[in-house]
Design a protein with these regions (language model features):
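Ribokinase/PfkB-type carbohydrate-kinase core domain
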Residues: 1-30, 54, 89-106, 111, ...
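Hydrophobic/aromatic pocket-lining and membrane-interface residues
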Residues: 65, 69, 78, 95, ...
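A glycine-rich beta-to-alpha transition motif near the start of alpha/beta enzyme domains, typified by
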Residues: 43, 50-52, 75-103
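Glycine-rich phosphate/adenosyl-contacting loop at the front of the ribokinase-like
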Residues: 1-77
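Conserved acidic
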Residues: 57, 61, 83, 87, ...
Length: 250
C-alpha cells in the first residue's frame, strides 16, 4: 500500500455545532470562509459560543486528511509545528494514537487553534489562530521526513506563506513524491490566484476543490471547472457536498 505524508498547519480544532447561520452573521464571519484572528480574538469568540455543542481534537486541513487515511490503515506521517503547551501535546498525542508518525517541531508561540463552526448543511466556517503553526519555515523541512513516502498531501492554507510552500513543493519533487493539494478555502484561492495556478501547473499531480474553491480558481461552475483543473494536473476532483465528487483524470 502507498505511504502518504501530510504537511500543513498543526492546529487543535474545536468543532462548534450551530443550529442556523445567525451566529456567523452576528460575528460577521462569511459562511464557508477561513478567517485568521489573533489569540485574544479566538479566546473572545470561543467565550461567546459557550452555549453551543462543542468537541475538541487535533486538526488542521491536511492533518484531518491524514487522520482519515490512517483510519483506513494507510501508513502516514505529518509535518507541522506546535507550541510548548497542552494543545501541542494534545495534537501530538492525537497523531500517535492513530499510528501517524509525528514530524513535529516546537515554536515559540502558543499552539494553533481553530474554531470550526458547522451549520446544518454541513458547511464549515473557520476562525483560526495559527500561532506556532505559522513558524514552520523552509529550514524545518529535512529530507528524512520525505524519504520512503509515495505521496505528499498539502493543504491550501499554506498558500499564505509563499516561500514555505515553494520549498515544500521543491522538496517533494526532489524526493520523487506525487503531490496532492487541497485548495482549502475560496478566499485563500482568490488572494493567491496567479501564483497558485503556476504552482498547480508546475508541481501538483492531484488537485482537490469544493464548489466555491473551484469557482474561485476557474470562474466556472463545477463541471466546467473540473475540465479546466484537469488540464493543469493528472487528476482533478471537485467536491459537491451531498452529491459526492466529480473526478477527471487528464
Amino acid at each position: 500500500m502507498k505511504k502518504v505524508l501530510g504537511i500543513g498547519n498543526a492546529l487543535v480544532d474545536t468543532l462548534v455545532k450551530l443550529e442556523d447561520d445567525a451566529f456567523l452573521e452576528e460575528m460577521k464571519l462569511p459562511k464557508g470562509s477561513m478567517q485568521l484572528v489573533s489569540q485574544d480574538d479566538i479566546v473572545d469568540i470561543e467565550r461567546k459560543c459557550e452555549g453551543f455543542e462543542k468537541s475538541m481534537s487535533g486538526g488542521g486541513s491536511a492533518a484531518n486528511t491524514i487522520h482519515g487515511l490512517a483510519g483506513l490503515d494507510v501508513e502516514t506521517a505529518f509535518i507541522g509545528k506546535v507550541g510548548k503547551d497542552e494543545l501541542g501535546d494534545l495534537f501530538a498525542d492525537d497523531l500517535r494514537a492513530k499510528n501517524i508518525r509525528p514530524f513535529l517541531m516546537q515554536g515559540e508561540s502558543h499552539s494553533g487553534h481553530a474554531l470550526a463552526f458547522v451549520t446544518p448543511d454541513s458547511e464549515r466556517t473557520f476562525t483560526t489562530y495559527l500561532g506556532a503553526a505559522l513558524e514552520l519555515n523552509p529550514e524545518d523541512l529535512q529530507d528524512r521526513f520525505f524519504e520512503g513516502f509515495d505521496y505528499l498531501h498539502v493543504e491550501g492554507y499554506l498558500l499564505q506563506n509563499h516561500s514555505l510552500l515553494q520549498a515544500i513543493l521543491e522538496k517533494a519533487r526532489k524526493n520523487r513524491l506525487k503531490i496532492s493539494l487541497d485548495l482549502a478555502s475560496f478566499n485563500v484561492v482568490e488572494e493567491n490566484l496567479h501564483v497558485l495556478k503556476n504552482w498547480v501547473r508546475d508541481y501538483v499531480d492531484i488537485l482537490f476543490a469544493n464548489e466555491e474553491e473551484a469557482k474561485a480558481f476557474t470562474g466556472k461552475d463545477p463541471e466546467q471547472a473540473l475540465e479546466e483543473m484537469a488540464r493543469l494536473c493528472e487528476i482533478a476532483v471537485v467536491k459537491v457536498g451531498k452529491g459526492g465528487s466529480l473526478v477527471r483524470a487528464a
